[in-house]
Amino acid sequence: MPLVNIKIAKDNVTPEKKAELIKGATQLLVDVLGKNPQTTVVIIEEVDTDNWGIGGISVTERRKLGL
């Protein structure tokens, strides 16, 4: 049973977009690895931008700086 864990910034991603991510990730494993879509698990974790850092700066701060 393959498991895909997708981490995204908590950014008002709509349920429809999350459904697209789940469908797309599942299909990718079917197409590339021949996995059964019925046993493929996709988890989407939304991370608060204060808890996500890039280059030593939180995503919240990077956005304020226009980076």
Protein language model annotation of sequence segments:
Residues 2-67:
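A domain-level signal for the structural core that forms small-molecule/cofactor-binding pockets
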